[in-house]
């Protein structure tokens, strides 16, 4: 399929959004209201919901491993895999919130594989890559949209959404780096075997040159 841009609007935000993080909720709210107003005038239609991308200085990945001893050999079910994934999501991450989880692989015996369902084992080890951000970064962003009375359809991790559109699957399979140079931040995402393996946002950008 193809994507067509029907309208575009922007507001100067350097005084209240710094390195991708909302610092002044009121001013961010005002900018959002103005953007929606301009878009609706251009489109001559009402915008009901919006998709919001989150990135910024605090966004990065952390790895986690969940071990589960089954006591006896049994066939690994989807319910068991889901239970391990739920345990990973519930892990504390020090004043941060998990934005998205990328399952890496599962270790069964001495073997690693992407899909363990149907394999017989008495032990399973799940490896996960958690994309996290400061809790207040996500909260301030959501609060700004709430105060502007703009309904959010979904909250997306911006680098993942951009890479999905711009990076060919063959490159992700072979291994590649996706680098997004911004004004105040630079985002680096590493892909290998079709999966995200590392992501970080560096607080340096074009304004530092």
Where are these regions (language model features)?
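Catalytic P-loop NTP-binding/switch module of NTPases
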Residues: 209
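Short C-terminal beta-strands that terminate individual repeats in beta-propeller domains
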Residues: 201-202
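Nucleotide/phosphate-binding catalytic cleft detector across ATP-hydrolyzing
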Residues: 1-178, 195-197, 206
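Short beta-strand scaffold segments in enzyme catalytic cores
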Residues: 1, 186-190
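Short, glycine/acidic-enriched loop or turn micro-motifs at the edges of active sites
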Residues: 182-183
């Amino acid at each position: 399929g193809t994507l067509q841009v029907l309208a575009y609007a922007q507001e100067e935000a350097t005084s209240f959004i710094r390195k991708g993080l909302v610092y002044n909720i009121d001013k961010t709210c005002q900018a959002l209201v103005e953007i929606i107003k301009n878009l609706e005038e251009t489109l001559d239609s009402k915008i009901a919901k919006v998709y919001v991308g989150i990135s910024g200085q605090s966004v990065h990945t952390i790895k986690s491993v969940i071990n589960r001893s089954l006591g006896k050999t049994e066939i690994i079910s989807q319910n068991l895999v889901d239970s391990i994934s739920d345990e990973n999501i519930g892990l504390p991450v020090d004043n941060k919130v998990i934005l998205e989880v990328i399952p890496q692989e599962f270790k069964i015996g001495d073997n690693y594989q992407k899909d363990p369902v149907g394999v017989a084992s008495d032990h399973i080890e799940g490896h996960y890559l958690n994309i996290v951000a400061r809790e207040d970064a996500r909260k301030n962003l959501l609060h700004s949209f709430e105060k502007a009375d703009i309904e959010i359809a979904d909250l997306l991790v911006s680098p993942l959404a951009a890479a999905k559109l711009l990076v060919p699957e063959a490159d992700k399979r072979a291994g590649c780096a996706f680098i997004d140079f911004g004004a105040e931040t630079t985002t680096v995402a590493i892909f290998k075997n079709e999966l995200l393996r590392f992501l970080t946002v560096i607080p340096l950008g074009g304004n530092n040159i």
